[in-house]
Amino acid sequence: LQIHRAVSAAQSVVLAHSVGHDVQQQVADVLFARASADGRLSASLGGLFPTGAGVTITPHTPTHFNPEEYGMSSVALRRIDSIAKRGIQEGAYPGCQIVILKDGKTMYDHAFGTHAGKGSALVRPTDLYDLASLSKTTGTLLALMKLYDRGRFNLSDKLSDYLPWLQRTNKKDMTIRELLLHQSGLPAGIVLYPEAIDKESYKGRLFSARKDALHPLRLGVTTWANPNFHFKPETLSRTRNANYTLQICDSLWLNKSFIKVIQEKIIEAPLGTKQYRYSDVGFILLRFLAEQLAGMPMDEYLAREFYEPMGLERTLYLPLQRIPKAQIVPSANDKFLRKCVLQGFVHDESAAFQGGVSGNAGLFS
């Protein structure tokens, strides 16, 4: 009777058919999701659990812990709720998810608000987000570390030894180490969209310092834009076909030959001194390097070597190929260039114009 009451009141129960030390250790590991358990009851247990009852636990199953056991305060963590809700009320963001880990243990994991304001989907703990520049360290850098460990390159190697299109340029002597340290002299970024816009399709200038009839769209404090332009038909298409294969939003496909335009823009980019300057361009080049060394697209290499073996099924590039759009939080409402809400498509322009996989951005999780 006492056991019946105890089991009825328990939040979870692990059934083990032995009191041996090894079994006790296995049960402890299951409780902390350090070991797997996938058994099912072969017979009912006194009205408590029916035949076939059971859940599957794997080392990837999320678990929660008492913050006080790790030197943290539950009271202090609960204050985060009010801060997150105030941000939503003041319009700073429509929703968010906040996760706090300590020593690999989940101390706090809560979702707030909606994807895009009133009437849109609620934020869920399993939703995906555009990781933006975190793609550099959680994507590109991982690929290069693996390739380095396999002896495929040295940090002192010149990038042009692997990317021949750089050999007759002022970038021919840049080393891989310089790119990783953001000390190559490359600029912070390159602007690609002017190469896709038909300059004959709009009147006047594309941007203005003040709002007027031609520039109704505000992009910044002193920047107003003319959104009434068309793309070059040889660059972008409203339908997919054999040449237009790189999707950059719901209804725009980029010509796969645009990669040559990107290479030209990198070649033309001015070089500064070898001092620290954070550069997306350097990591765009490192993606080209990773693919050259791996012999396959970087997103496929990362999935094979890291994400799939680690059970990170919801960490990936090009998420719409595997994840329903409703499970991806919108990144932005692009009223100027792509003229749509970006949901499942990378926000970063440089990554978008590479089809969604880039060394500087593109990863979702």
Predicted regions and their residues:
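C-terminal non-catalytic regions of proteins with extracellular/luminal or membrane-system context
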Residues: 1-66, 70
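Extracytoplasmic/secreted envelope proteins and their assembly/folding machinery
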Residues: 24, 28, 77, 81, ...
